[in-house]
């Protein structure tokens, strides 16, 4: 499963986004299931609504309902870990959605991610010392 961040979803939906063509190429070529978190899902819906309108938000939700990707269920122990991560990276600062993706990586046992956030995900570490592999911006 490949982890997906908000920036990838936005690039995929927005034809004016600098990374739109790259996002389309990646989504056409990848053959692995995609997974995100409810924090990212919510952030994506909000940004799609405010930047592109209700139709874009509804298409995203319908993609989920059609099985286009999975959403990881966070438990209270995951939220505790997110709190620790947000404290650790307070100088960046780390937001809730990013913290949830680090927790997701820790649960999956890998950091293969689709994100346009090169800076932050080059700093974040899952299980405190493993780096993320950005499959979006590094895709051939």
Predicted regions and their residues:
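Short, well-structured N-terminal submotif of metal-dependent ribonuclease cores
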Residues: 1-36, 49-61, 139-140
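Alpha-helix/helix-capping structural signal
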Residues: 7-8, 39, 77, 119
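Structured helix-beta-strand junction loops
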Residues: 29-33, 67, 92
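Short, hinge-like loop/turn segments at secondary-structure boundaries
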Residues: 51-55, 90, 129-133
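Active-site neighborhoods of divalent-metal-dependent phosphate/nucleic-acid chemistry enzymes
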Residues: 71-116
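Acidic, PIN/NYN-like endoribonuclease modules and their adjacent C-terminal/linker elements
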Residues: 109-140
């Amino acid at each position: 499963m490949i982890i997906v961040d908000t920036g990838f979803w936005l690039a995929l939906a927005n034809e004016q986004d600098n990374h739109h063509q790259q996002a389309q190429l990646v989504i056409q070529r990848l053959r692995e299931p995609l997974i995100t978190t409810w924090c990212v899902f919510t952030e994506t819906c909000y940004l799609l609504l405010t930047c592109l309108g209700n139709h874009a938000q509804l298409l995203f939700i319908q993609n989920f309902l059609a099985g286009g990707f999975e959403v990881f269920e966070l438990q209270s122990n995951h939220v505790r870990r997110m709190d620790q991560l947000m404290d650790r990276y307070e100088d960046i600062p780390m937001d809730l959605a990013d913290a949830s993706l680090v927790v997701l990586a820790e649960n999956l046992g890998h950091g293969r991610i689709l994100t346009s956030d090169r800076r932050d995900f080059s700093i974040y570490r899952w299980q405190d010392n493993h780096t993320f592999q950005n499959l979006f911006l590094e895709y051939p």
